[in-house]
């Protein structure tokens, strides 16, 4: 008779399955399924590595010119992404956010679902954005140094981590179909935040007017923002009526 006991090597064990879900969702999946779909106000966050595709193209050219095998050099990009995903997962969890999914070199997450006092959410979400931005620089430098020392190559393309944040309403919950189901957030505000991420450049943290207005109302607010007028040639698709966004540029040192 076959042994059906679950072991640590079983890909369907609880421990292994937990790697495919955000920790909060995995721990509360039964309750979330019973809750169905609900409207929630959340801080939506998208991260993306700017110019990552350009870096990949640059390395492909290098491989064709100088190397017979492309595996090793692209393994270094794999390790860079692994460190980035790991740091993002830790960062989001520690700030009580939910990591919805990795989207290539991008990340979709949201903050506020677990909080009763929403005022605390702002500092956690913005703090997560700043911390991940800072730590990504260390991750980037580590792996670019290896590319240089092991392969004698320093890429021309400079990658950075950009971020978009928006305060809005989403439809969050258990979305079912016979072939595949998912616990996620959808809605117009999610799409809008995704457009903001497309607007951001290099290592910018760009936020919506809605989030900026909310930050201004917080007691003892320490976050500094800069108003940005959207150029005509960079209008947000489907949201052309939006004239301004804001860039988070730091904290008030007086506090």
Show where each model-derived region lies.
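Catalytic NTP-binding/metal-coordinating core of nucleotidyl cyclase/transferase enzymes
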Residues: 15-127
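Short aromatic/basic micro-patch
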Residues: 46, 164, 205-206
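Catalytic core of nucleotidyl cyclases, primarily class III adenylyl/guanylyl cyclases
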Residues: 91-124, 139-186
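Short amphipathic alpha-helical segments
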Residues: 57-59, 176-178, 219
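Substrate-engagement module of ASCE P-loop NTPases
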Residues: 81-87, 128-136, 192-198
